[in-house]
From Swiss-Prot:
Spans traversing the lipid bilayer: none
Protein name: Integration host factor subunit alpha
Task performed by this protein: This protein is one of the two subunits of integration host factor, a specific DNA-binding protein that functions in genetic recombination as well as in transcriptional and translational control.
Keyword Nucleotide-binding: no
Gene symbol of the encoding locus: ihfA
Length: 99
């Protein structure tokens, strides 16, 4: 199972007493700010959670898996995430819930 933005909004609604509309808007604004920062080439550091970084990948040779033909894979910018030590520790020590 995956955590969705809708579930995050519902959690904020229940825990903070926000209206459903405000909870949804808060989640959307958070992710929009992360997107905006990354689009502007900024690193996003969330203390106790992790860092979102941009990495430029160079063009490299690739292969079409169907035909075996050599093709170039174009240079591109990708988003990477590096979890912080607190998040790593909590995940390592967590017991997954059964569905």
């Amino acid at each position: 199972m995956a955590l969705t933005k809708a579930e995050m909004s519902e959690y904020l609604f229940e825990k903070l007493g926000l209206s459903k509309r405000d909870a949804k808007e808060l989640v959307e604004l958070f992710f929009e700010e992360v997107r905006r920062a990354l689009e502007n080439g900024e690193q996003v550091k969330l203390s106790g959670f992790g860092n979102f970084d941009l990495r430029d990948k160079n063009q490299r040779p690739g292969r079409n898996p169907k035909t075996g033909e050599d093709i170039p894979i174009t240079a591109r910018r990708v988003v990477t995430f590096r979890p912080g030590q607190k998040l790593k520790s909590r995940v390592e020590n967590a017991t997954p819930k059964e569905d």
